């Protein structure tokens, strides 16, 4: 993140966890509001202490989190939510198409048997919802494909995007790329979502897989035009 991220009100919270048979570095994000911090994605099981440490470094207690927004229901984003909610009295929000997977009414869409403890969803999101933050308005964008109700969060005043898994940057060189086909059930919708992102003015992106990327609209348009081929 830029050096002035503390003033900007948006902070990446990179955590390294054991997930399945892999060691992953993942990037939840904290967004400051007048009410307190909002957490974007909770990480998988075992993420709690890493998130707590990041919040402490920013001058917050874990208990200050009042809202958790899930970009989608995959276990590496939502599997740690039950543990988090044991320590935090927070509102849980996700897209209405993702809610049944989070609450346990449906099994995870990718069918990998990675069923985490279900939690209640308090607020169902839809595209066009705007959340006021200290970094300016944060708009909910519907970016389905990687998951049926995947959302990304867009800050139009600064051209800043929290992509979730609609975009990734976890290759060796950190290049901004489209979602990985092997983890994306509906690549046609995913490509449409990249095309939608290409219509926005974006200068900087945070990817859950890859972290902060200092590139935006030009690269996203390339991905859309090439059909995610690279």
Describe the role of every protein-language-model region:
Residues 38-40, 69, 92, 160-162, ...:
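Residue-level marker for buried hydrophobic side chains located in beta-strands
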Residues 46-48, 54-130:
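Active-site HxH/HxHxD metal-binding segment of metal-dependent hydrolases
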Residues 2-58, 152-170:
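Conserved beta-strand hairpin/beta-sheet module of binuclear metal-dependent hydrolase folds
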Residues 45-46, 137-144, 148-227:
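Metallo-beta-lactamase
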Residues 122-144:
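Internal catalytic-core helix/loop-beta-alpha segment
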Residues 7-17, 109-113, 134-136:
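Short Pro/Gly-enriched beta-strand edge/turn motifs at strand-loop
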Residues 6-8, 87-88, 201:
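Short, structured coil segments at secondary-structure junctions
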Residues 31, 41, 51, 72, ...:
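Divalent metal-coordination and catalytic microenvironments
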């Amino acid at each position: 993140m830029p050096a002035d991220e503390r003033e900007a009100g948006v902070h990446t919270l990179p955590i390294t966890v054991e997930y399945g048979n892999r060691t992953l570095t993942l990037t939840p994000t904290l967004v400051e509001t007048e009410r307190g911090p909002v957490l974007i994605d909770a990480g998988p099981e075992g993420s709690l202490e890493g998130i707590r440490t990041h919040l402490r470094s920013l001058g917050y207690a874990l208990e200050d989190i009042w809202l958790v927004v899930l970009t989608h229901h995959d276990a590496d984003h939502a599997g740690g939510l039950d543990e988090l909610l044991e320590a935090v009295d927070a509102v849980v929000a996700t897209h209405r198409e993702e809610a049944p997977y989070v609450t346990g009414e449906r099994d995870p869409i990718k069918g990998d048997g990675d069923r985490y403890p279900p939690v209640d969803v308090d607020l169902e999101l839809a595209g066009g919802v705007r959340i006021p933050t200290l970094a300016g308005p944060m708009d909910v964008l519907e970016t389905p494909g990687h998951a049926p109700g995947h959302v990304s969060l867009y800050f139009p005043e600064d051209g800043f995007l929290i992509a979730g898994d609609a975009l990734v940057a976890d290759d060796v060189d950190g290049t901004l790329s489209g979602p990985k086909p092997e983890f994306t059930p509906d690549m046609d919708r995913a490509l449409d979502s990249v095309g939608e992102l290409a219509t926005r003015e974006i200068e900087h992106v945070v990817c859950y897989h890859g972290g902060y990327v200092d590139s935006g609209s030009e690269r996203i348009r390339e991905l859309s035009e090439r059909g995610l081929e690279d």
